[in-house]
Amino acid sequence: EMRGYATMIKVLFICHGNICRSTLSESVFTHKVNTLGLENMFVIDSAATSREEIGNPPHRGTVNKLRELGIPLVPHRARQVTLDDYDKFDYIIGMDTANIRNLNRMLKHDPEGKIYKLLSFAGSGRDIADPWYTGDFDETYRDVEEGSEGFLNYLREKGKI
């Protein structure tokens, strides 16, 4: 059923450049939501803390990993997170400690408690390593998959879905 925009669950995935981890998360989580038939309940997007990759498409490692898994790539151009995003989104989900630190600085120290680290939803304090440096998109995918599943379970427990 189509929800009104105000009641939709608005999720923004964040990483440093918005070409590797956050775009992978956006596509993986979108696929999970679509598979569950919940696409009308969510607004899902991604953004960067940095300006380095603005306007660039997802990294070829992200594109290739999704293709290998048969998960549709959500088309995206890298953009930097804004204060408007803070007002718009309910969950602003970073990948590592540096993302969280930068988000807190950029988004007025998170007065509404919207900033989370993805693997915290899977009961872990671990960072998701940046495959731009590691080259290991398999490990990144496993972490993103685990965090996304944990986030869905969190939303179920909260009675949101």
What does each of the following model-derived ranges do?
Residues R3-K88, N153-I161:
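Conserved active-site segments centered on acidic
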Residues Y91, T97-I161:
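Phosphate-binding/catalytic loops
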